[in-house]
Regions:
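Extended, low-polarity transmembrane helix blocks
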Residues: 5-59, 77-85, 92-149
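Perimembrane loop-to-helix junctions flanking transmembrane segments
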Residues: 64-77
């Protein structure tokens, strides 16, 4: 092998890696099926997590009924019932993609209230509420995707 062949093979290797690096750094838009599958996975994961929070509140209903925070001045029990409705029934609609944006409105209200009123807009104290809020806002904007009821 001459020096010229080694140099041209090295240049070819670099060019191939540049293409791969370019594809990695600047990927092409994904097709709608893979994006819809991603939205489905996000809906199922965050919806199930939200549903579990609602089940915990339903399970401890009698203890929480009188001590649940009431930031909207509608009563502790009504606030708790609204949160259980949002976290259980609306999360099922969220996961299924049925009446998607309509089912997200109570979920967004609960997370906005939790983050700004209960946790005082502190990311340190209200980290989970902030994560749910950001995911729900992005999902509200993007819609449920193709894999929805």
């Amino acid at each position: 092998m001459t020096g010229m062949n080694i140099q041209s093979e090295g240049l070819l290797f670099i060019q191939k890696n540049e293409i791969r690096m370019k594809d990695f750094l600047f990927p092409q838009p994904t097709d709608s099926k893979s994006f819809s599958l991603l939205l489905l996975c996000l809906r199922l994961f965050f919806g199930l997590m939200f549903l579990l929070h609602g089940l915990e509140k339903l399970y401890n209903y009698t203890e929480l009924c009188f001590v649940f925070p009431d930031p909207m001045n509608i009563g502790s029990e009504i606030s708790l019932l609204f949160v259980i409705f949002a976290e259980m029934l609306c999360s099922i609609g969220f996961m299924a993609g049925a009446l998607f944006r309509l089912s997200m409105i109570p979920m967004l209200i609960v997370m906005i209230t939790a983050f700004f009123h209960i946790h005082g807009a502190s990311i340190v104290q209200g980290e989970l509420a902030f994560i749910y809020l950001m995911v729900f806002i992005m999902m509200y904007i993007s819609g449920p995707g193709q894999y929805a009821v």
